Every structure is written in structure tokens, then in C-alpha cells.
Amino acid sequence: MAYPFQLGLQDATSPIMEELMNFHDHTLMIVFLISSLVLYIISLMLTTKLTHTSTMDAQEVETIWTILPAAILILIALPSLRILYMMDEINNPVLTVKTMGHQWYWSYEYTDYEDLCFDSYMIPTNDLKPGELRLLEVDNRVVLPMELPIRMLISSEDVLHSWAVPSLGLKTDAIPGRLNQATVTSNRPGLFYGQCSEICGSNHSFMPIVLEMVPLKYFENWSASMI
């Protein structure tokens, strides 16, 4: 999860987030090299006294500055398209969870189980226990099995919301009347925090999301106790 004065991204917990972090580093390196080159050229233009006043055209240079940016854009676009495809693809999910956004809480329904559904509200600051996080803890966590593909169906009952868990690389809009899909996969157990990431009203800041990723055996015990 995030911590005060953090500069980088949160630690990746899913294969998708690992790919996104690699793509971020790849793109940042390209942007840094281009920026350095542009600043170097500008500094030369400001400091040198040599000018080419008689130059009418330079086809070779024009060809280079047309082809080179196109090649750079392709180097950025290809990994991006690959990750977009990976984010939309889901093969044989072991579990489907329907997520509904409300003003201002989330409700969850495990569609593979009968009568396994609950609402998830933020715990008020006055009710927090020692060690719990302000504005991030909920009364009912979403318990899911780790290392398995899980399909999340996301929608809204009222206004636009956005279901986001940064460490898993997830951010999916919850739109009234529309059903969006996301894939959840975690490489390790633990608690993973997120929040509504779309302005949805006065209590928008009080819609936390908590995923508890556990081994399959513990998930089966939890689901049996909830039914």
C-alpha cells in the first residue's frame, strides 16, 4: 500500500501491475532521452554563434525528423497495446464477483454461491482499532483466493464510481446501466487497499476498498462460514 512521501508506484501484486510498471519505466526512459536531447539542442542554439543563413532546405534532416519520431511512437505503442490486450483478456475464471457502487459504499455478490453477498462501509475514525488505517478500513472485506483468475463485474446503482486497487493495477469505472469487467489475480496473500477514484458526491473520499487475498483452503472455509 502507499505510505507518506512515497514517490514511486506501489509494489506490484499482480502480473498486470508488473507489466504496467515495466511499461512505465520503458516510457519514462524514452521521455528522459528525448528531453535531454531537446535541452542539449536548445543550449547549443543559445550559445553557438554559427548559423546557416544560406540553407534553403535540408531533405535529409527532414526525413530523419519524420521517421525517427514515428519509430519512437511505435516503440511506445506496441507494449501499450500488448498490456491493453492482457487487461481485457480473461480465461476460465474460477470465481465471479459482482461489485455495485452506491453513494457512498460498495456492495459485493459472489455469483457462484447462493446468498453470499454483503455491503462494505468505511469504518468511522472513532471506531478504529489500534493499527488500523484511517479512511481505508471497512466493516466487510472482499475475501478472494490468491494465484487464481477472478472476474469482477462492476456497475453502479446511482452515479459514476470507479473501483480501483493500485497495487493490483485495477481501475474500472462503475457506470449505471452498464456492466464492466476486470480480472483480479494476486501473486501473494495480504490486504490490498483502494478507493473510489471517480468524484461521486460529498462523501466520495469515504468509499474505501479492501481485498483480502488468502490461499484457496482459507477462502473455502470463509465462504462456508458466510453461507
From Swiss-Prot:
GO molecular function: copper ion binding; cytochrome-c oxidase activity
Annotated Mg(2+) binding sites: 198
Positions contributing to Cu cation A1 binding: 161, 196, 200, 207
Entry GO CC: mitochondrial inner membrane; respiratory chain complex IV
Topological domain spans for side Mitochondrial matrix: 46-59
Spans within the Mitochondrial intermembrane topological domain: 1-14, 88-227
Phosphotyrosine, modified sites: 218
Keywords: Copper, Electron transport, Magnesium, Membrane, Metal-binding, Mitochondrion, Mitochondrion inner membrane, Phosphoprotein, Respiratory chain, Translocase, Transmembrane, Transmembrane helix, Transport
Signal sequence residues: none
Gene3D superfamilies: 1.10.287.90, Cupredoxins - blue copper proteins (2.60.40.420)
Pfam family, one: COX2
GO biological process: ATP synthesis coupled electron transport
Binding-site residues, Cu cation A2: 196, 198, 200, 204
Cofactor note: Binds a dinuclear copper A center per subunit.
Entry's localization field: Mitochondrion inner membrane
NCBIfam families in alphabetical order: CoxB (TIGR02866)
Oligomer and partners: Component of the cytochrome c oxidase (complex IV, CIV), a multisubunit enzyme composed of 14 subunits. The complex is composed of a catalytic core of 3 subunits MT-CO1, MT-CO2 and MT-CO3, encoded in the mitochondrial DNA, and 11 supernumerary subunits COX4I, COX5A, COX5B, COX6A, COX6B, COX6C, COX7A, COX7B, COX7C, COX8 and NDUFA4, which are encoded in the nuclear genome.
Family as reported in the entry's similarity comment: Belongs to the cytochrome c oxidase subunit 2 family.
Alphabetized PANTHER family for the sequence: CYTOCHROME C OXIDASE SUBUNIT 2, CYTOCHROME C OXIDASE, SUBUNIT II
UniProt-recorded name of the protein: Cytochrome c oxidase subunit 2
